[in-house]
């Protein structure tokens, strides 16, 4: 009995230990499922959030960058300093942050006090080595004329900048600053960009044909007889007809003889010289200058200038045309945009006095900041050709004689001794224009002007058969050339100095000077006359 009871108790214990309660198993499974599902949901949410933010960042445009790049759209690659000590260390970082803080203080005070550099300077995070460049740019656009001139002077004296800093100035400055740099003696040529690409020529066309079309597009009515003659002669000639008629012109002494003598040894430039001579006459009329600009004449003349670098006569006529167009202030922006300022800035530094003088006339007519006068065709300033703060005490006017020219008359006589045998001191003293070289050096306060007019023995019956030259007509023409219209009044630009001195070439030059300065319209009168 007792054995049976013991067996029953043992069986109950075994049954109780092997069959756990079902409710505990169910809650354990639920907890495991919750943990797995929660981890999956949380990880998926984080992943989706990251992808959405990354996609939003990729497709969103930072407008602050666009505003910042408005002032730095032309900046070239920055150079890295070779001194590693400047790029590392706490001291360098502190100095950089201090400079930024100072600039912010200056910008804030500029806004309050309305300083000239307030707006652009305060909105751009400019590096330390660029502050001077941007301040000079802002200073060059000041409303105060003295401030602008000082900025241009400081730019011209900068010779330690990197290439990209010169290009930055060239691309960001206004036309007045660019012209001022071109007329500054010490300016670096890196300030001037290359001229814009020239438009391509039309199919089956040439520069000769384009030049003839430009000449034909100019007004042909109400013209002087000589202008009509030059125009008709240029339009009627071509390379083939000129070759066929050349013998006749020489044999019978026609009007083509002076042309044939002036063409030099460049046959390809012969017909172009005909057209350029005619366009020079047209460019003396203001309305015709507008037509030349509207019909692409500035670009075409630039193409000819580049093609005939070895032909000074072609280049001289082209510069005469540009100089005449520069007399019209409303064409200044077109002349600057076409790249002529860069070309003339390089020509100003030429060793050839004639080329430099033509370029100086063009830039002086473009410069309305420091030059009040306008130099007509045939008037060349030999000194000063650059901007100067020195006041002009006297004008020296050189008028050449019958067989002379504006530059040829005043050259030094060639020495019979060979150049190799000359001492170095003698070579240094030699000059092709002594008023520009010697007189300007001895008397820097002078303005030295040379006047050119047509004068060869054959020009008594000039290249234009309808023109009759006389002493009175020549002097009258020079008197008109020396008169420069300022605003609405016709005044004589020589009247701005205290004294006038004449440099006269022989007897003929003396009589021309007498006729010019004894006329009623001339404000200058000789102090003493000698018979």
Curated annotation (Swiss-Prot):
Membrane topology: Single-pass membrane protein
Region forming the signal peptide: none
Keyword Lipid biosynthesis recorded: yes
GO cellular component: endoplasmic reticulum; membrane; mitochondrion
Keywords attached to this entry: Endoplasmic reticulum, Lipid biosynthesis, Lipid metabolism, Membrane, Mitochondrion, Phospholipid biosynthesis, Phospholipid metabolism, Transmembrane, Transmembrane helix
Listed GO biological process terms: phospholipid biosynthetic process
Keyword Transmembrane helix attributed: yes
Superkingdom of the organism of origin: Eukaryota
SUPFAM superfamilies xrefs: ARM repeat
Compartments it resides in: Mitochondrion membrane; Endoplasmic reticulum; Mitochondrion
Transmembrane segments: 33-50
PANTHER family named in the record: PROTEIN SERAC1
Role, per record: Facilitates the transport of serine from the cytosol to the mitochondria by interacting with and stabilizing Sideroflexin-1 (SFXN1), a mitochondrial serine transporter, playing a fundamental role in the one-carbon cycle responsible for the synthesis of nucleotides needed for mitochondrial DNA replication. Plays an important role in the phosphatidylglycerol (PG) remodeling that is essential for both mitochondrial function and intracellular cholesterol trafficking.
Family: Belongs to the SERAC1 family.
Protein's name according to its UniProt entry: Protein SERAC1
Gene source species: Macaca fascicularis (Crab-eating macaque)
């Amino acid at each position: 009995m007792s054995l049976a009871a013991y067996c029953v108790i043992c069986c109950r214990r075994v049954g109780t230990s092997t069959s756990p309660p079902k409710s505990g198993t169910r809650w354990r499974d639920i907890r495991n499922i919750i943990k797995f599902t929660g981890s999956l949901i949380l990880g998926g949410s984080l992943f989706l959030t990251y992808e959405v933010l990354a996609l939003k960042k990729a497709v969103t445009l930072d407008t602050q960058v666009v505003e910042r790049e408005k002032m730095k759209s032309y900046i070239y690659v920055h150079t890295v300093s070779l001194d590693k000590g400047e790029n590392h260390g706490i001291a360098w970082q502190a100095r950089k942050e201090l400079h930024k803080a100072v600039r912010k203080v200056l910008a804030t005070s500029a806004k309050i006090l309305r300083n000239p550099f307030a707006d652009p300077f305060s909105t751009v995070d400019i590096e330390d080595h660029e502050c001077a460049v941007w301040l000079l740019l802002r200073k060059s656009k000041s409303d105060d004329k003295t401030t602008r001139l000082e900025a241009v002077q400081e730019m011209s004296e900068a010779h330690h900048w990197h290439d990209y800093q010169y290009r930055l100035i060239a691309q960001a400055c206004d036309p007045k600053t660019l012209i001022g740099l071109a007329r500054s003696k010490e300016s670096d040529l890196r300030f001037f960009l290359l001229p814009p690409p020239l438009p391509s020529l039309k199919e089956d066309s040439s520069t000769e044909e384009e030049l003839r079309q430009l000449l034909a597009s100019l007004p042909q009515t109400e013209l002087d007889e000589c202008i009509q003659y030059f125009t008709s002669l240029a339009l009627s000639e071509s390379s083939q007809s000129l070759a066929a008629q050349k013998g006749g012109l020489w044999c019978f002494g026609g009007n083509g003889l002076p042309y044939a003598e002036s063409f030099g040894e460049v046959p390809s430039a012969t017909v172009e010289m005909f057209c350029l001579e005619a366009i020079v006459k047209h460019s003396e009329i203001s309305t015709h200058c507008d037509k030349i600009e509207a019909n692409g004449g500035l670009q075409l003349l630039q193409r000819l200038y580049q093609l005939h670098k070895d032909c000074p006569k072609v280049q001289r006529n082209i510069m005469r045309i540009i100089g005449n167009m520069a007399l019209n202030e409303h064409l200044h922006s077109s002349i600057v945009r076409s790249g002529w300022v860069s070309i003339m800035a390089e020509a100003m530094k030429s060793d050839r006095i004639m080329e430099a003088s033509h370029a100086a006339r063009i830039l002086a007519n473009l410069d309305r900041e420091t030059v009040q006068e306008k130099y007509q065709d045939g008037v060349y300033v030999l000194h000063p050709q650059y901007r100067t703060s020195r006041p002009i005490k006297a004008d020296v006017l050189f008028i050449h004689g019958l067989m002379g020219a504006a530059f040829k008359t005043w050259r030094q006589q060639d020495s019979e001794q060979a150049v190799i045998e000359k001492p170095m001191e003698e070579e240094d003293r030699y000059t092709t224009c002594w008023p520009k070289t010697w007189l300007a050096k001895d008397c820097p306060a002078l303005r030295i002007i040379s006047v050119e007019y047509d004068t060869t023995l054959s020009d008594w019956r000039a290249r234009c058969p309808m023109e009759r030259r006389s002493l009175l007509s020549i002097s009258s023409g020079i008197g008109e050339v020396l008169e420069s219209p300022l605003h609405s009044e016709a005044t004589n630009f020589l009247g701005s100095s205290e004294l006038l001195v004449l440099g006269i070439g022989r007897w003929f030059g003396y009589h021309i000077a007498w006729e010019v300065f004894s006329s009623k319209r001339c404000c200058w009168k000789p102090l003493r006359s000698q018979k």
